C-alpha cells in the first residue's frame, strides 16, 4: 500500500528531512554502558551497526540517526536493517540512508512481514453508545458482528464492515473518538509499539487517499500527560498494587484497565484515559 508506506516515511523522518542528530556508534556505545536496562539489546544493535559497515551497504559517515539507534528515511533499527532491508534501486546494496527506493521498498517489506494485507484497510472511525461498558483495546479482538451487537456504529451511519476480527480502540477514553481496528493496524503498531504511532500512520494513510480526518471530538476538559507524567502515573498505579508493567510512559491495555479501576474507586467517569485529572487524584491520595 503506497499510501501507508508514504505515511511511515512522513511520520518517521518528515520525508527524509529529520532524524539525523546522533552518530550511531557513539550513541549506541553510550547506551550499552549507561542504560539502566536493555543493555544487551543495545549491544546487539551496536554489533548490527558494525555488520552493516562490514557488509558494505553504507559508509561510516552515513550512520547518523536517533539517540536510540534508528536511522534512515524510515528509521530502521540496525538489526531490522540487516533483517529486512532490501535493494530497491538495483545497485546491489541496501542503502536506507541515501536511496529513497531502497528505504521505501524496505518499509514495504517490513509491513508485509508484519502481516499487512494489500488492499485491506486498517480500520475506521466508529461511535460507541452512551454508557458503553464492553471490552476495548487493540488486542481484544472480536468479529464485526460482536461489535454490532454492542451498539458500535460507523461514524456517519451505516453498518460495520471488514473481514476478520477487530479491536475497539478508544485512545482518549469513552468520551473521545473510537476506532475499529483490524490486522493492518497491528502491522502499523509493530513498527513502533505505540497506539499513538499506529493511529498517526493509519489516519495519515487515509488522508493521503483523500478521505476525511477524524470526526469525533477529542476531550478538552482534561489535559493530556507528558511522557514523564505518564511514567509517574504508572508508578503511582504500581504502588497501589496494579500490574501495569514497566513504568515506561507507554500506555497499554494494563495501564488503561488500572486507570478505569481507580476512576471507579474515586467516583470518576470510567474512561481509562491517562489525563491530568486522574494523575492529580492519585497524587493527592
Where do the model's predicted regions map?
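Catalytic glycan-binding domains that act on GlcNAc-containing polysaccharides
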Residues: 1-164, 176-179, 187-205, 210-227, ...
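Short secondary-structure transition/capping segments
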Residues: 16, 102, 257-260, 283-285
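Acidic/histidine-rich, surface-exposed loop or edge segments in extracytoplasmic proteins
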Residues: 182
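Short acidic, glycine/serine/threonine-rich helix-capping segments at coil-helix boundaries
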Residues: 225-230, 238-282
Amino acid at each position: 500500500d503506497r499510501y501507508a508506506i508514504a505515511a511511515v516515511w512522513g511520520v518517521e523522518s518528515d520525508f527524509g528531512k529529520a532524524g539525523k542528530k546522533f552518530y550511531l556508534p557513539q550513541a549506541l556505545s553510550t547506551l550499552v554502558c549507561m542504560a539502566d536496562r536493555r543493555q544487551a539489546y543495545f549491544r546487539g544493535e551496536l554489533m548490527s551497526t558494525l555488520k552493516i559497515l562490514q557488509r558494505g551497504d553504507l559508509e561510516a559517515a552515513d550512520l547518523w540517526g536517533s539517540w536510540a539507534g534508528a536511522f534512515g528515511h524510515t528509521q530502521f533499527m540496525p538489526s531490522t536493517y540487516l533483517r529486512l532491508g532490501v535493494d530497491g534501486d538495483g545497485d546491489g546494496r541496501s542503502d536506507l540512508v541515501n536511496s529513497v527506493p531502497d528505504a521505501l521498498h524496505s518499509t514495504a517489506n517490513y509491513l508485509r512481514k508484519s502481516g499487512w494485507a494489500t488492499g485491506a484497510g486498517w480500520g475506521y472511525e466508529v461511535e460507541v453508545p452512551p454508557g458503553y461498558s464492553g471490552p476495548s483495546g487493540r488486542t481484544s479482538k472480536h468479529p464485526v458482528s460482536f461489535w454490532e451487537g454492542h451498539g458500535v456504529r460507523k461514524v456517519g451511519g451505516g453498518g460495520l464492515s471488514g473481514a476478520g476480527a477487530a479491536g475497539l480502540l478508544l485512545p482518549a477514553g469513552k468520551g473521545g473518538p473510537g476506532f475499529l481496528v483490524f490486522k493492518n493496524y497491528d502491522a502499523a503498531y509493530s513498527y513502533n509499539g505505540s497506539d499513538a504511532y499506529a493511529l498517526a500512520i493509519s489516519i495519515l494513510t487515509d488522508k493521503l487517499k483523500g478521505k476525511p480526518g477524524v470526526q469525533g471530538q477529542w476531550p478538552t476538559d482534561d489535559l493530556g500527560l507528558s511522557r514523564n507524567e505518564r511514567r509517574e502515573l504508572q508508578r503511582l498505579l504500581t504502588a497501589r498494587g496494579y500490574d501495569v508493567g514497566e513504568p515506561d510512559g507507554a500506555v497499554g491495555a494494563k495501564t488503561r484497565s488500572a486507570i478505569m479501576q481507580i476512576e471507579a474507586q474515586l467516583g470518576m467517569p470510567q474512561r481509562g484515559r491517562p489525563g491530568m485529572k486522574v494523575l492529580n487524584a492519585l497524587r493527592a491520595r
